[in-house]
């Protein structure tokens, strides 16, 4: 299940920092960006913008914005 995450954005809407338990971490590099739209035929469609990010502490993380709500989440795999 995705976990809510606080994100700082640049003017183009791309994440530049994420809030972690220890405070804000800067994004060093945008590794990948893609969008997905699904379930458009239902009452609860899905529209998300995904960003794979390299953080200043060396971790790679994937976050997405629910484009219908505007909320941001960390995507966990596995």
Model-derived features with residue positions:
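Non-catalytic peripheral regions of nucleotide-handling enzymes
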Residues: 1-78
């Amino acid at each position: 299940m995705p976990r809510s995450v606080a994100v700082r954005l640049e003017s183009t809407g791309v994440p530049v920092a994420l809030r972690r338990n220890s405070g804000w971490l800067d994004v060093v590099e945008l590794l990948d960006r893609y969008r997905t739209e699904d379930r458009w035929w239902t009452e609860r469609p899905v529209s998300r913008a995904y960003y794979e990010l390299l953080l200043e502490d060396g971790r790679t993380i994937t976050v997405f914005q629910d484009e219908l709500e505007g909320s941001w989440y960390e995507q966990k795999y596995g």
